């Protein structure tokens, strides 16, 4: 009844006035009307009077960087396999040209990417496995190998309530060849081509709304080539300066979210050409009479070409579209890699490795451990 209602207030502002850059501006009011014509105003109507001012900014919760950041973690998954198969092609493996190796390893891939340039960052954690085989094909052909793997992980938004579960399946072809320069020096050439497909399942929770979910696929290609020169020194030490080229190309499907304030995401792409250049220090000792090889390589990594993923995002609920973009990591970074292997007997060996890459205040980690059998 009239007099029982004081007025309408917005849940967003706590007053009748709505003045927010992320929403349409205006004022709420109310009135009582005589709906049945009996002369008594018994129906309450809420009235919205818009100012006609358009929305000037997109609510940061709606922008959707987590979806586009998925291409970064897909690329990292591909590098977890592609980089590890190259690390297997060390001087000792390439010198054993006629051996056939079957191997398996566990993989770990982790990223702590801070928000940067107004774009939301992410934290990624993933684990999985890979298996492979390689064999020598004569003195002039080097060693060829093939590998398959799978990584399962999830990425979390740094600033909002979003989580993306990722399942990546990968395959890699790799090759390496050793060329003797002298009794104490040799050149190594190696490369790999890795393909990965990632299935994404993202859940977003926007303030005041039920959760929305979106599913889509990413496809990633990674091509790597490396040249290095190893020289032997006194005390069993080896020094290996190296130059590597890494080209990554990723593609993300368009998709539509379901539930909540579901959004429409356009397809996006990632391109990056990186050149790591550095030095590897290694030596081989004995542990309980068994050969034990260790190496540490450090390098500067620079991106000479890069297209950060971006695409159009549309919200049917607000009838608005905008350009969404992934976070842009620093172009320059430092990478450190440690690898070790122990020859258990004539047939069996175990190995492991750890890689750390720092770009500004963001960190990327990869670990691996496995076993190989020679035939």
Where are these regions (language model features)?
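Outer membrane beta-barrel translocator domains of Type V secretion systems
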Residues: 51-234, 351-374
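Extracellular, surface-exposed repeat/solenoid domains
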Residues: 1-50
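Surface-exposed loop/turn motifs in large extracellular/passenger domains
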Residues: 4, 8, 217, 236-238
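Outer membrane beta-barrel transmembrane domains
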Residues: 172, 264-375
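Beta-strand segments within the central parallel beta-sheet cores of soluble alpha/beta enzyme folds
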Residues: 189-192, 240-241, 293-297
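Solvent-exposed flexible segments
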Residues: 227, 239, 244-252
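Extracellular/periplasm-exposed beta-strand and loop segments of Gram-negative cell-envelope proteins
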Residues: 112-114, 120-122, 153-166, 197-221, ...
């Amino acid at each position: 009844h009239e007099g029982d209602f004081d007025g309408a207030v917005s849940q967003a502002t706590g007053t009748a006035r709505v003045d927010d850059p992320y929403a349409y501006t205006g004022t709420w009011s109310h009135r009582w009307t005589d709906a049945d014509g009996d002369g008594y105003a018994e129906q309450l109507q809420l009235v919205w009077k818009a100012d006609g001012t358009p929305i000037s900014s997109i609510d940061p919760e709606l922008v959707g960087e987590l979806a586009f950041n998925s291409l970064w973690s897909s690329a990292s998954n591909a590098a977890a396999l592609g980089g590890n198969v190259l690390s297997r092609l060390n001087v000792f493996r390439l010198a054993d040209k006629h051996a056939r190796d079957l191997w398996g390893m566990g993989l770990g891939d982790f990223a702590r990417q801070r928000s940067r340039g107004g774009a939301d960052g992410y934290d990624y954690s993933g684990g999985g496995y890979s298996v492979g085989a390689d064999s020598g094909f004569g003195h002039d052909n080097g060693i060829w190998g093939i590998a398959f793997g799978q990584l399962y992980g999830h990425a979390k938004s740094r600033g909002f309530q979003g989580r993306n579960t990722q399942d990546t399946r990968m395959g890699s072809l790799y090759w390496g060849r050793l060329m003797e320069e002298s009794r104490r020096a040799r050149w190594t050439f190696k490369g790999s081509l890795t393909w990965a497909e990632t299935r994404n399942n993202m859940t977003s929770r926007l303030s005041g709304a039920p959760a929305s979910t979106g599913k889509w696929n990413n496809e990633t290609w990674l091509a790597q080539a490396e040249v290095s020169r190893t020289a032997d020194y006194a005390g069993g030490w080896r020094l290996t300066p190296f130059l590597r080229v890494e080209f990554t190309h990723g593609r993300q499907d368009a998709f539509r979210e379901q539930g909540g304030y579901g959004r429409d995401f356009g397809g996006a792409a990632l391109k990056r050409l990186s050149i790591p250049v550095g030095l590897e220090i290694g030596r081989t000792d004995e542990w309980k009479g068994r050969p034990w090889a260790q190496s540490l390589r450090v390098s500067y990594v620079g991106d000479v070409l890069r297209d950060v993923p971006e695409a159009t995002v549309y919200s049917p609920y607000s009838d608005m579209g905008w350009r969404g973009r992934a976070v842009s990591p620093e172009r320059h970074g430092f990478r450190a890699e440690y690898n070790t292997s122990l020859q258990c007997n004539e047939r069996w060996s175990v190995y492991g490795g750890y890689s750390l890459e720092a770009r500004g205040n963001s960190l990327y980690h990869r670990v691996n451990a496995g076993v190989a059998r020679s035939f």
